[in-house]
């Protein structure tokens, strides 16, 4: 029997996207008694098939029905006509390498690091004359950060001397430093780089009906145990409270009323080729920094000729990501990292400087080196010789990474490429991305610090990711920025669109700046705030 994907009558809210932004809003509004419908372009992934996905990830060439192949994108079914895109910037942008369309969104394969933005991130223009200011400050978001940490089940500690002020402890204790963290510790102390724990959205002890982390070490791209947070938890809560979540229902456009000021319906397709209109009193876009833009542009009309909610011309502009900088190599003693799949220590000492350079977050990577399976499959030797090679190449690696901030630049943007279409005949997103001189300078500076750490350890450097080799961390931000001036921004401080009374936008696309902190906790905090405001608006 075919699954029912017909629209829901009398919906209060239609949410587009079932990643963390949409799922948190859905759960909170459904639990408040509102009629909620969630539409997502991707499928539901069966929790029982996570072991098969793990096998596909660890064993190249093993392909399961659920996995679609051994690659990160293949594990979650990304690629093909449905997910087509183009990249026309000065740096190619591999969009599908780190996004997932499906119930749970990109939390299905994220690493799970969740730190708060610093106070300077909200006041970059006022403090340093660069970037932009947020229309809200850290104090406005602070209580919602605490809510978000409880919602995600964050394991952390108050040991970061550079962190913004807190109001309560993290819900779970921090994970202890890894063995390789202890190797870095003396070098960092000598260089006056205080190390501290990393807040993680993974259970250090049982929480929210999920077990503690058991150390598979494959957090990215798949956590078989369920200890790492995924938005599936909030989807389950939303459905338990009466929300309806429809998968494989890609929204084609948003239809508005005669005056163009209110959204009437989200028009979505189904696998059977039907097209439906989901009407609702309010609509929340929560499908990421690329697809939020694409849907607004696809919804162009006589009333909104440049795209919905785009009277400012800012929709799609100011696309930001975090750039990676790193140094890796080997040391003459075991690092014992094979059981760790996430970061347990980092350093924010380079973040809040007085100069106007982008922020930098140092990360001590629990990197054990290339997989022994892959090494063995590609080796030319056998037997004891192969074993000696594997022992020499595995478990002695060290790496120090960094996330480096990008300032918002209008020329970095998401547009529609009308020369290429998806499986429904719609123009695909085009990503135009480049790295500015200030970010290149910050990468050069952090590379110097990373090299100094290796020199202090007397470790050999095998590779460096610098300004020319940098790539994205796949944190899509800034493309529907918030602000108080409708001529310069897309949404107001409450994340409601300036141009449409009943349209809210959730997620990192509303960030005016991105700092150098992983964005998901801020996404979750803003989603808690949106749900509170929307609950009041619905009455």
Where does each model-flagged region fall?
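A conserved FAD-binding loop/helix module that cradles the flavin
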Residues: 513-532
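A glycine-rich dinucleotide-binding beta-alpha-beta segment and adjacent secondary-structure elements
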Residues: 79-82, 197-201, 207-208, 212-222, ...
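Beta1/beta-strand and adjacent pyrophosphate-binding region of the FAD-binding site
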Residues: 7-21, 285
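Extreme N-terminal leader/targeting segments of oxidoreductases
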Residues: 1-13, 31-32, 60-61, 528, ...
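FAD cofactor-binding and catalytic pocket of flavoenzymes
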Residues: 80-99, 103-106, 110-111, 134-138, ...
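Glycine-rich loop(s) and the adjacent beta-strand/alpha-helix scaffold that form part
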Residues: 28-31, 35-37, 41-56, 240, ...
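Conserved redox-cofactor binding core of oxidoreductases
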Residues: 62-79, 86-87, 92, 113-116, ...
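Conserved N-terminal glycine-rich FAD pyrophosphate-binding loop of Rossmann-like flavoproteins
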Residues: 43-70, 100-109
């Amino acid at each position: 029997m075919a699954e029912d994907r017909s629209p829901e009558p009398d919906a209060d809210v239609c949410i587009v996207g079932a990643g963390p932004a949409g799922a948190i809003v859905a759960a909170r509004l459904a639990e408040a008694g509102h009629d909620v419908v969630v539409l997502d372009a991707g499928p539901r992934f069966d929790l029982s098939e996570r072991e098969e996905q793990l096998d596909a990830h660890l064993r190249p060439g093993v392909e399961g029905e659920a996995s679609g192949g051994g690659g990160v994108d293949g594990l979650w079914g990304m690629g093909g006509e449905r997910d087509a895109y183009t990249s026309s910037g000065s740096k190619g942008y591999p969009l599908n390498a780190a996004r997932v369309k499906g119930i749970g969104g990109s939390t299905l394969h994220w690493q799970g690091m969740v730190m708060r933005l610093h106070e300077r991130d909200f006041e970059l223009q006022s403090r340093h004359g660069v970037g932009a200011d947020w229309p809200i400050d850290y104090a406005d978001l602070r209580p919602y950060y605490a809510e978000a940490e409880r919602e995600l089940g964050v394991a952390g500690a108050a040991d970061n001397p550079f962190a913004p002020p807190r109001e309560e402890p993290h819900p779970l204790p921090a994970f202890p430093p890894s063995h390789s963290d202890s190797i870095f510790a003396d070098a960092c102390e000598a260089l006056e780089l205080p190390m501290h724990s990393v807040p993680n959205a993974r259970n250090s002890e049982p929480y929210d009906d999920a077990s503690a982390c058991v150390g598979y070490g494959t957090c990215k791209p798949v956590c078989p145990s369920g200890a790492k947070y995924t938005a599936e938890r909030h989807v389950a809560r939303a459905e338990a409270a009466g929300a309806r979540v429809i998968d494989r229902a890609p929204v084609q456009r948003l239809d508005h009323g005669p005056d163009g000021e209110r959204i009437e319906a989200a028009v979505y397709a189904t696998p059977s080729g039907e097209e439906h209109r989901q009407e609702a009193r309010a609509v929340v876009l929560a499908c990421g920094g690329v697809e939020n833009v694409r849907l607004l542009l696809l919804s162009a009309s006589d009333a909104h000729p440049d795209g919905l909610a785009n009277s400012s011309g800012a929709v799609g502009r100011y696309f930001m990501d975090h750039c990676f900088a790193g140094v890796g190599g080997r040391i003459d003693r075991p690092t014992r990292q094979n059981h760790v799949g996430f970061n347990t220590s980092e350093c924010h000492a380079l973040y809040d400087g007085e100069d106007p350079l982008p922020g930098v977050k140092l990360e001590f990577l629990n990197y054990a080196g290339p997989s022994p399976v892959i090494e063995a499959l590609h080796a030319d030797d056998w037997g004891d010789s192969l074993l000696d090679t594997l022992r020499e190449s595995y478990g002695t690696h060290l790496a120090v990474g960094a996330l480096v901030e990008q300032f918002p630049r209008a020329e970095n943007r998401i547009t529609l490429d009308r020369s290429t279409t998806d499986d429904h005949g719609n123009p695909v997103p085009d990503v135009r991305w480049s790295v500015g001189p200030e970010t290149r300078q910050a990468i050069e500076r952090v590379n110097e610090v990373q090299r100094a750490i290796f020199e202090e350890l007397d470790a050999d450097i095998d590779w460096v990711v610098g300004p020319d080799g940098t790539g994205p961390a796949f944190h899509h931000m800034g493309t529907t920025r918030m602000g108080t001036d409708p001529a310069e921004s897309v949404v107001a401080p409450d994340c409601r669109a300036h141009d449409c009374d009943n349209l809210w936008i959730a997620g990192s696309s509303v960030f005016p700046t991105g700092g150098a902190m992983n964005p998901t906790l801020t996404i979750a905090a803003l989603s808690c705030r949106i749900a509170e405001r929307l609950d009041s608006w619905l009455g």
